[in-house]
């Protein structure tokens, strides 16, 4: 539009007299020194619960895994997917995303008990979330079907479990919700040291129920994500955030500042 401006992604380049290896090391040094949050801080040795128990989370198992990693000199335990859901419990991957309340059948004493248990073992505690997502089988989607990325006059495009959907971060209400996911967890449990921020679906449904200009979705989605992450980092500057995204789906310099 007239008089409208847009900031494109930054371009970084390097010169190397040692081939590709030298160029790679240059970028690594630049990333640690200038881009990634806490880039030169020594990272804690951690154990993540996912491959050990998947979604079969319970207090006894988490306590045991914390004790195991502590006994080996580890410093951090991260509880992965499967800890949440009320009306729809997260026992498989086809439900509950967006319903970020503790499953009291699995964890009757809540997250606070796990944080305290980690401290008793002499380690820190971290937690998994996927705040940009929901499922068709969730209380969030039942309340806000207009919050998901969806092309007009087209069926839903679903991801993992056949039910996963992407929330539309171009929508300020969705931005507030996603920030609130992190803020609520951290407000209730301020000693959490680490968040594993997953994102197992990309923008595969090319439409917004919020935007007037549909071709702005990609740009406005990422602007919205940046606004959320700016708010998170401003309020929780010392929190370590892992950009998981099915492993390395967000391993890029653009996400590193947060």
Q: Language-model features: where?
A:
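Short Pro-Gly-centered flexible turn/kink motifs
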Residues: 2-17
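A generic structural signal for short, non-catalytic loop/turn and secondary-structure boundary residues
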Residues: 6, 39-40, 234
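Residue-level marker for beta-strand->alpha-helix junctions and adjacent short loops that shape enzyme
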Residues: 13, 84, 132-134, 202, ...
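Terminal connector regions
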Residues: 14-44, 51
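Short, well-ordered coil/turn segments that N-cap beta-strands
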Residues: 41-45, 73-75, 121-125, 191-193, ...
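Short glycine/proline-rich turn/loop motifs
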Residues: 44-50, 159-164
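Aromatic- and glycine-enriched glycan-recognition loops and surfaces
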Residues: 49-142, 147-148, 176-180, 220-230
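Active-site neighborhood of glycoside hydrolase catalytic domains
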Residues: 103-110, 117-120, 142-258
């Amino acid at each position: 539009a007239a008089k409208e401006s847009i900031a494109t992604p930054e371009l970084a380049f390097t010169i190397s007299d040692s081939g590709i290896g030298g160029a790679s090391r240059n970028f690594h040094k630049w990333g640690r020194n200038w881009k990634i949050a806490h880039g030169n801080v020594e990272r804690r040795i951690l154990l993540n619960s996912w491959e050990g128990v998947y979604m079969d989370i319970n207090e006894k198992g988490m306590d045991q895994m914390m004790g195991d990693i502590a006994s080996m000199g580890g410093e951090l335990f991260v509880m992965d997917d499967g800890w949440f859901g009320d009306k729809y419990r997260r026992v498989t991957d086809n439900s509950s995303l967006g319903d970020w309340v503790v499953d009291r059948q699995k964890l009757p004493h809540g997250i606070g008990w796990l944080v305290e248990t980690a401290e008793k073992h002499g380690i820190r505690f971290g937690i998994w979330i996927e705040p940009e997502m929901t499922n068709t089988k969730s209380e969030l989607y039942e309340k806000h079907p207009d919050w998901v990325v969806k092309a007009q006059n087209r069926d839903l495009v679903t991801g993992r479990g056949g039910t996963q959907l992407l929330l539309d971060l171009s929508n300020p209400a969705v931005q507030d919700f996603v920030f609130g996911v992190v803020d609520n967890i951290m407000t209730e449990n301020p000693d959490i040291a680490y968040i594993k921020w997953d994102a197992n679906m990309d923008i595969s449904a090319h439409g917004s129920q919020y935007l007037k200009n549909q071709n702005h979705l990609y740009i406005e989605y990422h602007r919205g994500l940046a606004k959320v992450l700016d708010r998170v980092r401003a309020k929780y500057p010392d929190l370590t955030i892992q950009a998981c995204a099915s492993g390395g789906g967000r391993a890029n310099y653009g996400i590193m500042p947060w």
